């Protein structure tokens, strides 16, 4: 028996079951098993770009997830960003539905909002 992992979008609807999401995720998996495994992992980010796109599609659906993934691909080049770059947990509510490209971060470094707290201030 198969187990299905359900992912919720910002609207609360499951996105992993829709036909376009499943189709795009299968294409990504095909890429990972064929071309990516032959060439090797070359991505500058963690998670890799294909894993990032897969998670963005599963979490946010085709409409926003595709643009979030494309924005990540546009940053993955020798002069682009590098390092840990997670998929956003939720979409910006102020972005109009007909402008999904505004969900993606197209350039610039990842903004770190968390700062470690030191208990000993004498460091």
From Swiss-Prot:
Its function? Could be involved in insertion of integral membrane proteins into the membrane.
Q: Which GO terms describe its cellular component?
A: plasma membrane
**Which InterPro entries does the protein's record reference?**
Membr_insert_effic_factor_YidD (IPR002696)
State the organism of origin: Beijerinckia indica subsp. indica (strain ATCC 9039 / DSM 1715 / NCIMB 8712)
Compartments (UniProt record): Cell inner membrane
Instruction: Extract the NCBIfam families matched here.
Output: membrane protein insertion efficiency factor YidD
Question: What is the protein name given in its UniProt record?
Answer: Putative membrane protein insertion efficiency factor
Domain of life from the UniProt record: Bacteria
